[in-house]
A protein has these predicted regions:
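Cofactor-binding beta-sheet edge motifs in enzyme active sites
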Residues: 1-141
Length: 141
């Protein structure tokens, strides 16, 4: 459980011969107990999932001669709206006590992405971001 909530995430993708990765869709299900504002839960999961996907595809802190190369978010790559795949969120009905939602979408996207990549390509990566291994995102679903 993440913050008292249970979450599952699946990535549907295809890998091209040149290591281009087309992410077709992201599907998450969350059981966060009693939901009083489903729109907020959807927004938190969608945003957290895309934030985590950006980190999994591109982001790392790099050092050169002992100095961090990223000074702020202007050189820390994030997905743009036109690059983002569809995100499907399913809220599991529950009468349990409410759990956390804020960061739950972010935590699972990396492992889900690596599992989908392994299933599609046969290559099992153990480090993120994917760009380190030569993979790059391709637009379009």
């Amino acid at each position: 459980a993440v913050f008292g909530s249970f979450v599952a995430t699946v990535v549907e993708l295809e890998v091209q011969a040149d290591k281009g990765v087309r992410i077709k869709r992201l599907v998450s299900a969350i059981d966060c107990g009693l939901v009083t504002n489903p729109t907020s839960v959807l927004a938190q999961i969608e945003g957290g999932t895309l934030f985590g996907l950006s980190a999994s595809l591109f982001n790392e802190i790099t050092l050169e001669q002992g100095q961090v190369q990223q000074s702020n978010f202007h050189n820390y790559r994030q997905l743009r709206i036109n690059e983002a795949p569809g995100v499907e969120v399913h809220i599991v009905p529950s009468s349990e006590d409410p759990g956390g939602v804020g960061e739950t979408g972010t935590a699972l996207i990396g492992p889900a992405l690596l599992n989908a990549l392994a299933a599609a390509s046969g290559e099992r990566l153990r480090r993120l971001p994917l760009s380190r291994a030569g993979y790059f995102p391709v637009k379009g679903a």
